[in-house]
Amino acid sequence: MRIYWTITGSVFKIGVLIVLLGAIQSCRSRKPQSENAVWGEIENKLGIRIQQRSDLQFYKEVVKWLGTPYKYGGNSSQGIDCSGFVMTIYEVVFGRKLPRQSAQQHKESRPVTAKKLAPGDLYFFDIQGKGVSHVGMHLTDDYFIHASTKKGVIVSSLKETYYSKSFVGFGAFRLGD
């Protein structure tokens, strides 16, 4: 009887050891996603090719908001407006508090040229002909992300007539500004 329990106990210990080794090996085989794969995923979601791959945290955050519905005065995933979107991204990604309204964001930003744009810099628009009333954030080339009144958070191009006609200028709120 004693031999039976010794053998049974040994088999049990070997079984536990095999299970533990398998678990350890599966943890080891899960490599973190490569940075190129992360960028590829972001580009697919945004529907654009990002030329200058910098500010990964910015891109990871804005992608989360794609498709969020528009809500005037909103600043949550349930609904957000253009200036609330900019304000939220700046606080989360850059740790910077911006004014709540697009006109005030324009007034307090530092003008920047197209050649000097960095991810997250702002695009300002006068949609209603009464001064700055819309804002978006630079992604790459002439692409920006913003909260559209009809489509929610989307990616658009400054080459689109609707935006090129109402474009006012670029602004920056970078560290040191």
Regions found by a protein language model. Name each.
Residues 120-122, 142:
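Structural motif
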Residues 28-40, 44-50, 96, 111-112, ...:
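Aromatic- and glycine-rich peptidoglycan recognition patches
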Residues 22-26:
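C-terminal motif of bacterial Sec signal peptides marking the signal peptidase cleavage site
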Residues 33-36, 40-78:
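Post-signal-peptide N-terminal segment of Sec-exported extracytoplasmic proteins
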